[in-house]
Amino acid sequence: MEYRTDQVPMSPRSVQGAPGTLPIRDHLPWSIFNLFYMNVCCLGLTAMIFSVKSRDRKVVGDVEGARHYGSTARSLNIAATVLGILLIIILIGLAATGTIQALKYKG
């Protein structure tokens, strides 16, 4: 194989942010998960709205607004996840004790 001089070898580059700044997180994947699987009291939907607002603020360049909306989305996602897990545990406990039954056989 012949090496051509008119081609420049490509190497992966990493983009460095400003030193001392933390990346702005919008928690969008977590919000999508909570929207579709653990939408307790519409907390997943609200978290999704705040995640999108955070991403929009990040695109515009409003760092403080993006951090605020991202923090709110994080708090709502935590609440939705905890309430969803508690609901699942309560339902499993009620089903195990026989308080609720999924199917009744009428024979």
UniProtKB/Swiss-Prot annotation:
It is found in: Cell membrane. The chain crosses the membrane at residues 32-52, 78-98. Keywords: Cell membrane, Lipoprotein, Membrane, Palmitate, Transmembrane, Transmembrane helix. One of its GO terms (cellular component) is plasma membrane. Residues 1-31, 99-107 are extracellular. It is a multi-pass membrane protein. Pfam families: CD225. Residues 53-77 are cytoplasmic. Expressed various cell types in torpedo electric organ and muscle, especially fibroblasts, capillary endothelial cells, and axonal cuff cells. A lipid is attached at C41, C42 (S-palmitoyl cysteine). This is Dispanin subfamily A member 2b. It comes from Torpedo marmorata.
